[in-house]
């Protein structure tokens, strides 16, 4: 079998796998391995990102959600060559934009925040994006749909502050499953119980994975985002960075 036919066969398998996965959008191991195999065969070897390089990939609302979108993620070490690639869904014409490499330390924990805003997008249009570093390290592709003038579904969540966030995570999973057409989700403050505690933010960010990479998020500030470890008030540093 020649290279062209092999690549076409692999892409056909990818399509079948993608069509049969569940409603939740997680990293699909089979999909990823086939996609990487196709890349190697075509001469473009892409290395998958480690979890430590691609934590909490998420979409954030931009000033105009119909023509722009902010993408953010975190890594455990500095990555000066962070990038975002994006394209029209199903297209091969990819555009690349550089992302930040901002260090943030709180509660004795350091993370590196990568962020960029895609602009000049077409309203009510489906795109795909992925994040990475340099020219050869990339995440999986995620979906991104710009807003239009039509009616759309929104998920609105009240306080999610919790002890271990297990129940909150189940709420997010269930609501995402029941509302597959969700175009935006909003959290109305008190995202975490203690705004200075790193564990709270890591667990909260992990719990929104059924939505975060593919649906834009808008949050409002609650008083719990402003608490110190000893329950005094401070600036909401973590909230403002994440």
Residue positions per predicted region:
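A structural signal for well-ordered alpha-helical scaffolds and beta->alpha junctions
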Residues: 66, 77, 168, 232-236
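Hydrophobic/aromatic beta-strand patches that form the interior of the parallel beta-sheet core
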Residues: 93, 155, 186, 218-220
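An acidic-aromatic substrate-binding cleft motif
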Residues: 137-188, 193-194
């Amino acid at each position: 079998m020649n290279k062209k036919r092999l690549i076409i066969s692999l892409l056909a398998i990818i399509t079948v796998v993608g069509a049969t996965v569940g409603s939740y959008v997680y990293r699909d191991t089979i999909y990823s391995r086939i996609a990487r195999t196709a890349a190697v065969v075509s001469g473009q070897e892409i290395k998958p990102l480690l979890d430590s390089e691609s934590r909490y990939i998420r979409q954030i609302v931009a000033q105009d959600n119909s023509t722009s979108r902010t993408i953010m993620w975190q890594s455990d070490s500095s990555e000066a060559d962070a990038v975002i690639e994006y394209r029209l869904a199903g297209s091969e014409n990819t555009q690349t934009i550089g992302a930040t490499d901002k260090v943030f330390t709180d509660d004795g924990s350091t993370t590196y925040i990568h962020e960029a805003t895609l602009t000049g997008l077409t309203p009510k249009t489906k795109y795909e994006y992925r994040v990475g570093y340099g020219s050869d390290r990339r995440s999986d592709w995620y979906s991104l749909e710009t807003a239009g003038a039509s009616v759309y579904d929104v998920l609105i969540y009240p306080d999610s502050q919790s002890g271990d966030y297990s129940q909150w995570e189940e709420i997010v999973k269930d609501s995402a499953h029941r509302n597959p057409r969700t175009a935006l989700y909003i959290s109305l403050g008190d995202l975490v119980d203690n705004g200075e505690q790193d564990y709270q933010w890591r667990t909260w960010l992990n719990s929104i994975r059924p939505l975060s990479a593919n649906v834009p998020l808008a949050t409002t500030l609650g008083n719990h985002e402003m608490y110190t470890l000893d329950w005094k008030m401070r600036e909401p540093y973590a909230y403002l960075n994440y």
